[in-house]
């Protein structure tokens, strides 16, 4: 009986460890277990502001104004369905010289989807981009950061580099601009100590639909740009890193 019980416990422990490893590989933004993904460059004085889930109406337009005021370029990972609904704003983002990346067509958790659905989401988004802004994306960020080998493989087959991040603003939570800016400042400081650049995850939209309020994110962006620039930080788009 002890042997049977012991074997069951060992099997359960192994299953738990395997599940934990899979979760880490699929969900931790800096994990490379499922294959190489672009995180950041090696210069600790470089940072990339990246904005997910747009375009989002006046919020995105105001963000473009803030970036222009600070002479900064950013990377926008846009949802295809939002681009379809607001093509004029997506064109404004591109015309302002910002880098546009693919964030899927409808923002599902791709790690749980079939291979056919993954390809449909990525290729559909790029088809919208080609129609609206005249070019497919060269970079892809998985919604929620959730990926598995098939997600990364499909992105590469479609000519895109998978991109994750190493600074999380946590701006999807109902927190203040000061809290968001503090999260970013701490992330940048950690990366500088480790001798690497900072890839900052922010949001100008929301995958639940258009009109998501993001004013704290915009205010935090202005704060971070002013403070980091004063400290000698340079802001780049993710294509500077690969």
What would you call each of these model-derived segments?
Residues 1-50, 61, 65-75, 186, ...:
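Terminal accessory/targeting
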Residues 26-111, 117, 121, 128, ...:
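Active-site beta->alpha N-cap acidic-glycine motif
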Residues 91, 118-122, 177-184, 214-220:
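Charged helix-capping and loop-helix junction motifs
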Residues 146, 152-193, 233-242:
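His/Asp/Glu-enriched short active-site or ligand-binding loop at hydrolase and phosphoryl-transfer sites
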Residues 51, 78-80, 102-104, 142-144, ...:
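A cross-domain feature marking catalytic cores of carbohydrate-active enzymes
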Residues 132-146, 151, 155:
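Basic- and aromatic-lined ligand-binding clefts that recognize polyanionic substrates
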Residues 108-113, 207-211:
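A short acidic, helix-capping loop that chelates divalent metal ions and anchors anionic groups
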């Amino acid at each position: 009986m002890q042997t049977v019980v012991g074997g069951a416990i060992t099997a359960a422990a192994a299953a738990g460890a395997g599940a934990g490893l899979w979760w880490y590989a699929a969900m931790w933004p800096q994990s490379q277990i499922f294959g190489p993904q672009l995180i950041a460059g090696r210069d600790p004085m470089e940072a990339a502001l990246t904005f997910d889930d747009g375009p989002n109406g006046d919020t995105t337009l105001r963000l473009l104004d803030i970036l222009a005021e600070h002479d900064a370029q950013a990377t926008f990972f846009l949802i295809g369905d939002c681009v379809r609904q607001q093509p004029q704003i997506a064109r404004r983002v591109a015309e302002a010289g910002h880098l546009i990346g693919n964030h899927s067509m409808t923002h599902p958790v791709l790690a749980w989807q079939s291979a056919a659905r993954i390809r449909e989401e990525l290729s559909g988004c790029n088809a919208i981009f080609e129609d609206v802004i005249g070019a497919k994306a060269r970079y892809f960020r998985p919604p929620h950061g959730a990926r598995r080998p098939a997600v990364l493989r499909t992105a590469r087959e479609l000519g895109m580099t998978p991109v994750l991040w190493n600074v999380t603003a946590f701006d999807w939570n109902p927190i203040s601009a000061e809290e968001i800016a503090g999260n970013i400042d701490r992330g940048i400081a950690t990366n500088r100590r480790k001798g690497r650049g900072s890839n900052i995850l922010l949001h100008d939209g929301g995958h639940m639909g258009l009109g998501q309020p993001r004013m704290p994110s915009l205010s935090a962006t202005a704060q971070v740009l002013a403070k980091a620039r004063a400290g000698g930080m340079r802001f780049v788009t993710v294509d500077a890193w690969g």
